[in-house]
Amino acid sequence: MEKKGSVLMLRYEVGKFLGQGTFAKVYHARHLKTGDSVAIKVIDKERILKVGMTEQIKREISAMRLLRHPNIVELHEVMATKSKIYFVMEHVKGGELFNKVSTGKLREDVARKYFQQLVRAVDFCHSRGVCHRDLKPENLLLDEHGNLKISDFGLSALSDSRRQDGLLHTTCGTPAYVAPEVISRNGYDGFKADVWSCGVILFVLLAGYLPFRDSNLMELYKKIGKAEVKFPNWLAPGAKRLLKRILDPNPNTRVSTEKIMKSSWFRKGLQEEVKESVEEETEVDAEAEGNASAEKEKKRCINLNAFEIISLSTGFDLSGLFEKGEEKEEMRFTSNREASEITEKLVEIGKDLKMKVRKKEHEWRVKMSAEATVVEAEVFEIAPSYHMVVLKKSGGDTAEYKRVMKESIRPALIDFVLAWH
């Protein structure tokens, strides 16, 4: 794989070495059929298994697969051999944003442009239940047109990564960019921690240096905990006001991405751009506003874990990366309907088919039994108002299961389905 000119999986010609991290090397490559330029991250499977990094890799795949946005590095496909995992990603040619600020501060209008793209992308991530947890200039790339691209979701957490208190409990991120509550180790909201990191990045772009600096790590943590910031005198009043709201040590009063995007400093010079990929993804939020039972439903509906989400996604069957499993007779679809609506519809379909229908109270499972086959359906939450529904044969004849699905159940669900997988 390290040799320039070698061919990977009969699909990609490997090019020059681009860089490496602790567990991965990145190469430029070219798709043999299309000629498209890509970046391939090569991960040593044995190394990550030895150090217990399996879940982190699964999270990165899940996060990147869920996110399709102009300002997020796109994951095209994942491949694997016995010893390696390959992430085939969009090749971002403009280098790191870090290189732009390594020589000093940026002009206010330039810094604002990058910050606008960053916050819009982070807000999009959060709407999909994903927090990045390691936002910093080194993880922000620039394309050939100077547009920002967020990369490196290795530390990302989906909403299912939380404990019962709804908080994350692992200290992630680079020290200078982490929020006070992350350092405290008492659990934190990853979405609010991302906002803090965005504030640190904005400060660096405008000032040319970090807001919290100390050679002693404990002293650095103290400064972060107290949000001790000295603003340079050249900072515009509007930028200073916004930074104070973002770099609030109290996560409960810290400004949200939504409010940041409404601030006058943020909106200055902002042009509303038509982004088809964003609009397409945003459809899943069309019915995000629920009734009074929505909060209860959110608690009861089972969240897919990160690996399950990606494994269920079209074109990304990763079951063989780390474990082997038996093939199951099942079909899946995504929906933007509430879990209660989906289960009610499934009950209705079962009754129309004269099947024996059983639904447990407070659970989003429906069992439809006929003489020849048994179909079980379960609803999983991927993000708020975005669900994955799994319909599987739990008994009876496989041919009859497929017939019932094709002729009756699938057509009856047409208004509930975003996509079959």
Curated annotation (Swiss-Prot):
Induction: Slightly repressed by salt stress. Its cofactor is Mn(2+). One of its GO terms (biological process) is negative regulation of abscisic acid-activated signaling pathway. Residues 299-323 form the NAF domain. Residues 152-181 are annotated as: Activation loop. CDD domains: CIPK_C, STKc_SnRK3. Keywords: ATP-binding, Kinase, Manganese, Nucleotide-binding, Phosphoprotein, Serine/threonine-protein kinase, Transferase. Residues 328-357 are annotated as: PPI. The modification Phosphoserine is found at S156. Ubiquitous. Co-expressed with CBL1 in guard cells. InterPro entries: Kinase-like_dom_sf, NAF/FISL_domain, NAF_dom, Prot_kinase_dom, Protein_kinase_ATP_BS, Ser/Thr_kinase_AS. SMART domains: S_TKc. Its EC number is 2.7.11.1. It comes from the Eukaryota. GO terms for molecular function: ATP binding; protein kinase activity; protein serine kinase activity; protein serine/threonine kinase activity. PROSITE patterns: NAF (PS50816), PROTEIN_KINASE_ATP (PS00107), PROTEIN_KINASE_DOM (PS50011), PROTEIN_KINASE_ST (PS00108). The active site is at D134. The activation loop within the kinase domain is the target of phosphorylation/activation by upstream protein kinases. The PPI motif mediates the interaction with the ABI (abscisic acid-insensitive) phosphatases. Belongs to the protein kinase superfamily. CAMK Ser/Thr protein kinase family. SNF1 subfamily. Interacts with CBL1/SCaBP5, CBL4/SOS3, ABI1 and ABI2. This is CBL-interacting serine/threonine-protein kinase 15. It comes from Arabidopsis thaliana. The gene is CIPK15.
